[in-house]
Amino acid sequence: MNLHEYQAKQLFAEYGLPVSTGYACDTPEEAAAAAEKIGGDMWVVKTQVHAGGRGKAGGVKLVKTIDEVKAFAANWLGKNLVTYQTDEKGQPVAKILVESCTDIANELYLGAVVDRASRKVVFMASTEGGVEIETVAEETPELIHKAEIDPLVGPQAYQARELGFKLGLNPVQMKQFVKIFMGLGKMFTDFDFALLEINPLVITDEGNLHCLDGKIGIDGNALYRQPKIREFHDPSQEDSREAHAASFELNYVALDGNVGCMVNGAGLAMGTMDIVNLHGGKPANFLDVGGGATKERVSEAFKIILSDDNVKAVLVNIFGGIVRCDMIAEGIIGAVKEVGVNVPVVVRLEGTNAELGREVLKNSGLDIIAAESLTDAAEKVVAAAEGK
């Protein structure tokens, strides 16, 4: 789950990190009132969406009058912002962040992720702020400095100082950096972050460090113990099919292919997508129905898959470990009858009662294509999707 910039900065402020005075607004009038409340003669107005590249897409602007603030909000609220990180439809803009203007002398980068290789939280800092860190990692990796956080003792001030020296900070800035580093380290574990970025972390004209932007990703598996973070959830920023699937405990991710995939188990689902791709097909989705694949969940999964107009065939790949294949077969038959599937359906069953399951499908009288193996299933579904 991702947070909006204004939500990230709200958390930053609670942990004593330096952020701009700002207000998230729902209407042009509210945005104008926020600018007046902040004061001054210059403001930054930002569209709030779960995507980067807002500035290049016109979603961030420096304005000098209240009328400009109001016009920016009126122009964007209720519309979609399309950036290089969104699809062609873009993301809906429901809030505008109005902030005080910050004079920038230099831009740095500070971020943290859960590193699977070291199995620790790793902080990254760079003098190359304000640009995509992936670009820096690819072109000049020596400019990215890292600090691994020991989970037993947490972030340490000496680690912050080591990074600060590499960033060329002066003694005053070093103190500020240590405070920011320690606050972010505590915040990362307190709220079960998966990703954290301040890009840019700026040095102002007065020589102070300031968190100019904020990007936070939360570990979705930890939301059950994060009631405060759950309140930040914005379903408008998610694919409607993915949100609908989650309500039925289905793990669904929309893709851009034409072969719908319904599988039990995330690993098997990824393997299924790989073999479809290997045989010349393009998966339209990732969909894991989980271990308890009941008729109701299979039926809902079919509905979600078929809501994508690009789907020309569906591959159902079930391994009967926890559940019996004959029971799954009955669920598939019931779902096909209920939903009224009008594209070819290829089913591969393996595991407990697999032979019985295939027999149930064969005797159903429905136009369901049975597959003997995963390779056979992939070949048949790709051919079916191509109309062969």
Swiss-Prot record:
Heterotetramer of two alpha and two beta subunits. Residues 9-244 form the ATP-grasp domain. Substrate binds at N264, G321, I322, V323. PANTHER family: SUCCINATE--COA LIGASE [GDP-FORMING] SUBUNIT BETA, MITOCHONDRIAL (PTHR11815:SF10), SUCCINYL-COA SYNTHETASE BETA CHAIN (PTHR11815). Succinyl-CoA synthetase functions in the citric acid cycle (TCA), coupling the hydrolysis of succinyl-CoA to the synthesis of either ATP or GTP and thus represents the only step of substrate-level phosphorylation in the TCA. The beta subunit provides nucleotide specificity of the enzyme and binds the substrate succinate, while the binding sites for coenzyme A and phosphate are found in the alpha subunit. Keywords: ATP-binding, Ligase, Magnesium, Metal-binding, Nucleotide-binding, Tricarboxylic acid cycle. One of its GO terms (molecular function) is succinate-CoA ligase (ADP-forming) activity. It comes from the Bacteria. This is Succinate--CoA ligase [ADP-forming] subunit beta. ATP binds at K46, G53, R54, G55, E99, T102, E107. Pathway: Carbohydrate metabolism; tricarboxylic acid cycle; succinate from succinyl-CoA (ligase route): step 1/1. Belongs to the succinate/malate CoA ligase beta subunit family. It is an enzyme of class 6 (ligase). The gene is sucC. One of its GO terms (cellular component) is cytosol. GO terms for biological process: succinyl-CoA metabolic process; tricarboxylic acid cycle.
